[in-house]
Regions:
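Short coil/turn connectors at secondary-structure junctions
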Residues: 1-2, 47-48, 54, 118-121, ...
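N-terminal metal-binding scaffold of metallo-dependent hydrolase/deaminase domains
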Residues: 1-45, 57
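Divalent metal-coordination and catalytic microenvironments
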Residues: 8, 27, 32, 55, ...
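A short, flexible beta-alpha/helix-coil linker loop
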Residues: 11, 92-93, 155-158
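Short, solvent-exposed loop/turn segments at secondary-structure boundaries
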Residues: 17-18, 127-128, 162-163
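Alpha-helical scaffold segments that flank or form the walls of functional sites
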Residues: 75-146, 170-184
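Metal-coordinating catalytic core of metallo-dependent amide/deamination hydrolases
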Residues: 132-221
Length: 222
């Protein structure tokens, strides 16, 4: 059993609108699961190593429920444009670069480290349509200790050059290849991700719906 004991000012929000602070409190975790928060260390943990953070605040991490990983290099750009113009001018060209796995590794390793550095440990994340880049993203998140869901985007119509799977069959094939390749991840799991209605044919949506039901997979979209 692995045991972690952290001492500091423990913040918790047991109910909506309630914030509790426990100065000099102890947070005890066994095998990665929090077992309790205590004003004094329980006797069964006496003598165990304690990470003492003094008066530092110990609080829950953040969860980002909608994050487009391949848009990380263009944060804050083009905010003067309406959505579709912004997609065509900034988002789609940036996402197309993730066909390059070397570029994907560079960007996604930085993104994973920055998430952890800023206290975000759980995500629901869009990748691009590139299977290999999506697997790299999952690898980097897992390496950094981020937990959550990642989706290989599906797009088989109405997309910019370089961001369109040539056929619906290719989209199906790459989705299955991705799912087969990511079965061994421990912290990061797959989530089916049709980008949005304009970019997915009815045939593709029917396939993804059937796949979600057969494999009990979650789905995210817009």
């Amino acid at each position: 059993m692995s045991l972690t004991i952290i001492k500091g000012t423990i913040l918790s929000a047991p109910t909506l609108g309630q914030l509790d602070a426990l100065p000099g409190g102890y947070l005890v975790a066994e095998d990665g699961l929090i077992r309790g928060v205590y004003g004094s260390l329980p006797e069964q943990y006496a003598g165990a190593p304690v990470e003492d953070w003094g008066d530092a605040l110990i609080l829950q991490s953040f969860a980002d429920l909608h994050l487009h990983a391949p848009q990380y290099p263009m944060l804050g750009m083009g905010m003067d444009l309406p959505l579709l113009d912004w997609l065509n001018a900034y988002a789609f060209p940036t996402e197309a670069r993730f066909a390059d796995t070397g570029y994907a590794r560079e960007i996604y390793s930085r993104l994973a480290r920055e998430l952890i550095a800023n206290g975000t440990t759980r995500v629901c994340m869009f990748s691009s349509l590139h299977t290999d880049a999506t697997l790299i993203l999952m690898e980097e998140l897992e390496k950094a200790g981020v937990t959550g869901y990642v989706g290989k985007v599906n797009m088989d119509r109405n997309a910019a050059p370089g961001l369109l799977e040539e056929t619906t069959e290719e989209s199906r094939r790459e989705t299955l290849r991705w799912l087969d390749a990511c079965q061994d991840f421990r912290l990061v799991k797959p989530m089916l991700t049709p980008r949005f209605t304009p970019s997915c044919t009815d045939e593709l949506m029917a396939f993804l719906g059937k796949l979600a039901a057969e494999r009990d997979l979650p789905v995210q979209s817009h």
